[in-house]
A protein has these predicted regions:
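Aromatic- and acidic-residue-enriched carbohydrate-binding clefts of CAZyme catalytic domains
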Residues: 8-12, 48-81, 109-142
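Active-site mouth loops of central-metabolism enzymes
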Residues: 11-23, 138-151
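Alpha-helix N-cap and loop-to-helix initiation/capping positions
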Residues: 71, 147, 277-278
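Active-site-proximal helices and loops of the catalytic beta/alpha 8
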Residues: 1-13, 27-33, 37, 44-61, ...
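Active-site-adjacent substrate/metal-binding segments within catalytic domains
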Residues: 17-20, 24, 42-53, 68-70
Length: 301
């Protein structure tokens, strides 16, 4: 393509169009391509309960069917078709680990409690079982259940049919691996698409590097600690607390996704929203380092 964009998403950089309407993304495609972004990541597009503009409600699925306030199936098809003219790929954020905090706020087919794990505790990063079976404020889908897999697989294939090139798997560390007798990743993740999963800090076990490596057999993963550390080091004026990236722990660079800040570090509340108070120049410097890493891709928020 005339913009010099990469053929593979992992080889380029990604623009996170967080909570943008699909029509607005489409209107900005000329500028996005000129800026050098190989891919655009949308917010989740599944149905959600009517909760106004609260950003995190799109991370609490009502049903796994395309269409919410950001756009419907027709808008997604239009976006993908137009994006491909510029050489821009489309990634859609998908929430597969959980639904809502109340089953009253999900569709009838998702109100069956047998579709969810019956572990009553919350997740604890020191306990892997609780990470994959516990709740993070929402009902935790039984991802090893063929019924759940069928629903999610159909949703992924509907996105693919619209022209979507890749999937960002929200909270993937909370979804069990094949070695843990959960066949979700084997049966639902489409390896003909680009896939990367959100793993914040640790997958939660006494041997996290083993789990990191297993996830990367199926998809790229986020290395949030590295990006956050670099940004905070610039802001603090020193690098004494830098620990290095996951490459130093045996994870291949072509399986990593970096950022200088994320929608969570900016939009969350309290201490979790630290990056909104960091001067943009420091975030920009962090992004320069992230994007300069060989093999890894970088998500620009």
């Amino acid at each position: 393509n005339k913009y010099g964009l990469k053929d593979k998403i992992q080889d380029g950089v990604i623009l996170h169009c967080f909570d943008w309407k699909l029509s607005d993304i489409q209107a900005e495609l000329p500028n996005i391509a000129k800026a050098g972004f190989t891919a655009v990541q949308t917010s989740p597009l599944h149905q959600k309960e009517n909760a106004g503009s609260i950003w995190y409600m799109v991370y609490q699925p009502h049903d796994f069917i395309i269409g919410n306030g950001l756009g419907d199936e027709a808008a997604l098809r239009s976006l993908c078709k137009e994006a491909h003219k510029y050489g821009v790929k489309i990634i859609v954020d998908v929430v597969a680990n959980h639904t809502n905090g109340s089953l009253k706020n999900v569709s009838a087919r998702l109100q069956d409690e047998s579709l969810y794990h019956d572990y009553k505790g919350y997740c604890n990063d020191a306990d892997r079982y609780s990470v994959t079976h516990g709740r993070i404020g929402m009902w935790d889908l039984k991802t090893e259940d063929p019924r759940v897999q069928k629903i999610l697989s159909a949703y992924i294939q509907s996105l693919k049919a619209c022209g979507v090139d890749g999937i960002r798997w929200d909270a993937i560390k909370h979804v069990g691996l094949p070695s843990e007798n959960d066949s979700f990743i084997d049966n639902v993740v489409d390896q003909d698409m680009y896939n990367y999963g959100e793993i914040l800090n640790t997958p939660g076990s006494s041997n996290p590097d083993k789990l990191f490596k297993e996830y990367t057999q199926y998809m790229s993963i986020t290395d949030n600690t590295y990006g956050n550390d670099v940004t905070q080091a610039f802001a603090a004026g020193g690098t004494s607390k830098l620990k290095g990236n996951l490459v130093f722990r045996g994870i291949k660079g072509n399986k990593l996704v970096y950022w200088g800040e994320s929608h969570d570090t900016y939009s969350n509340s309290g201490r979790d929203a630290w990056s909104k108070y960091v001067d943009q120049q420091f975030i920009d410097r962090s992004y320069a380092i992230m994007a300069g890493n060989n093999d890894a891709t970088t998500l620009y928020y």
